[in-house]
A protein has these predicted regions:
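Sequence/fold signature of self-assembling virion shell proteins
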Residues: 2-51, 70-81, 95-98, 131-155, ...
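Glycine-centered loop/turn motifs
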Residues: 60-64, 215-218
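Extended, non-catalytic structural segments that build the interaction scaffolds
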Residues: 56-57, 91-98, 103
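Short, glycine/acidic-rich hinge or "gate" loops at secondary-structure transitions
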Residues: 117-132
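Sec-exported extracytoplasmic/periplasmic mature domains
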Residues: 109-117
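Residues forming anionic-ligand binding surfaces in small-molecule and nucleic-acid pockets
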Residues: 81-90
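Conserved hydrophobic ligand-interaction patch in extracellular adhesion modules
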Residues: 167-170
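Solvent-exposed, polar/charged alpha-helical surfaces in well-ordered, non-transmembrane soluble domains
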Residues: 102, 106, 110, 151-155
């Protein structure tokens, strides 16, 4: 089983960290499901491939045909992000310190998860060099389909990712898609995720609604060692209870991590861009 935020929450013995990891996984379906790969450096170099090599049978004693696989070298730079969960001392007087800090930390962690998810999808590489899935597609690593919503359009974008693991869209788009395919005589099915969550599915690919995705876009991702993932330098998420600061009347918890999305081959990601959320005419 691949390392994810969902699986990691059961692997750490740190109570604070376990709670924060659990909040991240609960807040973001993307972070709950995406496979995480730990690396030892903030720079990571790899090659993306354009196609899989085709092999043929040969007679005994014959040599094998050597077919070159086109590849593109990519260098990713992991970027550091974090936040402080601060509780001023004056808020604590007469209250429960632990409860107040827990509440603030949960809110800050939810914000951390939402911001990280948004960057994983849409960071354009200009801000600190962090490149999201949308930019990978713009750079030619992935497939873009521009069509009105229809059953065939959904099939096309899902088929562009042969081993698709997940579909992401916001709730407005999901309602439009569900309405459109229903008029064509189709409905969504249901599947259970590795985390035990029952979700809608299209062609047995899990659908995760998230308000991070723009109104007119649908992303399809493959989660595997040769597909999409998230690089992490160090721990999946680092948490430090700094206690009451010496120079400020503040109780502080620090939440941080170093990340970079990765797409290892073109067939691992696709996006359906729907003009003005129109549905296809029958």
């Amino acid at each position: 089983m691949a390392l994810t935020f969902t699986s990691y929450k059961n692997q750490t013995n740190d109570v604070l960290q376990r709670g924060i990891v659990n909040t991240v996984a609960r807040t973001s379906d993307l972070l709950a499901e995406i496979p995480v790969e730990k690396v030892d450096s903030l720079l990571y170099r790899y090659n993306t491939t354009d196609y899989n090599q085709t092999l043929s049978f040969v007679d005994a004693g014959e040599g094998f045909e050597n077919t070159d696989v086109e590849a593109q070298a990519v260098i990713l730079e992991l970027k550091h992000m974090g936040t402080y969960a601060d509780v001023p001392l004056q808020m604590v007087r007469g209250g429960n310190v632990a409860d107040l800090r827990a509440n603030v930390t949960e809110v800050k962690t939810e914000n951390f998860a939402k911001n990280l998810e948004e960057k994983i999808f849409y960071a354009d590489g200009t801000s600190k060099g962090f490149k999201g899935f949308d930019q990978f597609i713009k750079d030619g690593i992935g497939t873009k389909v521009e069509k009105a919503i229809s059953y065939d359009a959904l099939c096309e974008v899902v088929d562009a990712v042969p081993n698709a693991s997940a579909i992401y869209m916001n709730r407005k788009t999901l309602r439009a898609v569900e309405k459109a395919i229903k008029t064509e005589g189709y409905t969504f099915g249901n599947v259970t995720t590795e985390g035990g969550k029952l979700v809608k599915a299209f062609n047995e690919v899990a659908i995760f609604p998230t308000e991070t995705i723009k109104d007119n876009e649908i992303f399809v991702l493959e989660y595997s060692t040769s597909g999409c993932g998230l690089l992490v330098c160090g721990d999946l998420i680092n948490t430090t209870d700094m206690g009451l600061l010496e120079n400020q009347p503040i109780y502080r918890t620090m939440i941080e991590g170093s990340y970079a999305p990765i797409v290892r081959q073109k067939g691992a990601i696709a996006k359906l861009e729907v003009p003005m959320l129109r549905t296809a005419k029958k």
